[in-house]
């Protein structure tokens, strides 16, 4: 049973050197930005009971979850989402609200083979709990824009949508669940022809304002002109209020000087069913992939306890790293300046010398070889020009000049030993 021992499971990969460093840096900068804005950290387990994700409407397809059994035979999953476990934490305890929380961790979701998506990704995010007005959405968007700015992410945009508008249309036109799932894909993919055929097959009246709004929905993306178009076709107070929320957000962000980062897309519909109002997606132009997603979910926490309004968003750390790699110079591993070769009974002196050299700005390594010749060979292979040997009674510095030559000698006990 060793067929797969040299391979990674589908949708996973190894991260090496630069990517590990960048992932850590991105997570840390996001974390610090969110902490500076008053968010408090929450960590949830990597594994959760299946029941946490199995409530009404199943916001995450069962087939997308990695499932297994615990020692008592209960079904456990690798968390496929960060927001739902946070909703469990908030719903099962009593809190003083408003509450602002932040998190970071790995998410596991089985995507279709050859979809180009990874099944394990890193997400960092924020949630504002207990506030049902537009200030919560604005706080989230400001926070993520400032975080992306600090990461020096270039050419990004945050799209604002409104899932409540879509839900109002579906309700008013009495479209049942199966049809709604098909309709959703047409609108999300901006498949105008398929949407037009859907309206024809359903024999919907194209003169009706709501039907006209439905047909226009995938085209309603851009700036405030989009809002004006939607307002003309809104046939209920609920629709008008949903549109007004997006308008207020957009105008506020423009006033704050963030208008260049914001656009409107009323045809955007999140694939997770727990969203109830304003939704967000963020993109970087260069890679064309989603880097931010989220929205308002006023009914989710109620599945675990007291119903509380909430809004949040997640940053896709792996996609940020991909963008930063394309923006930056090719990665070079840290160059070693000096290798210290030592006899084992002189390790303490060698370690003191290493610390001293690092304080002087030198990248000094302790050799892992017992033979000096092997240390020399390692140094040459890695283009390191200096080797210091800590012998029984003294230090010897070797430099490469077509061959290894002795540069200077000093007493081992002399902690102030300096290289040129």
Swiss-Prot record:
A single MF term (Gene Ontology): transferase activity
Biological pathway: Amino-acid biosynthesis; L-histidine biosynthesis; L-histidine from 5-phospho-alpha-D-ribose 1-diphosphate: step 1/9
Pfam families tied to this protein: tRNA-synt_His
One record GO biological process: L-histidine biosynthetic process
Subcellular location: Cytoplasm
Presence of keyword Ligase: no
The entry's keywords: Amino-acid biosynthesis, Cytoplasm, Histidine biosynthesis
GO CC annotation, single: cytoplasm
PROSITE patterns: AA_TRNA_LIGASE_II
Keyword presence, Cytoplasm: yes
Note: This function is generally fulfilled by the C-terminal part of HisG, which is missing in some bacteria such as this one.
Subunit relationships: Heteromultimer composed of HisG and HisZ subunits.
Function: Required for the first step of histidine biosynthesis. May allow the feedback regulation of ATP phosphoribosyltransferase activity by histidine.
PANTHER family: ATP PHOSPHORIBOSYLTRANSFERASE REGULATORY SUBUNIT, HISTIDYL-TRNA SYNTHETASE
Similarity field: Belongs to the class-II aminoacyl-tRNA synthetase family. HisZ subfamily.
Name recorded for this polypeptide: ATP phosphoribosyltransferase regulatory subunit
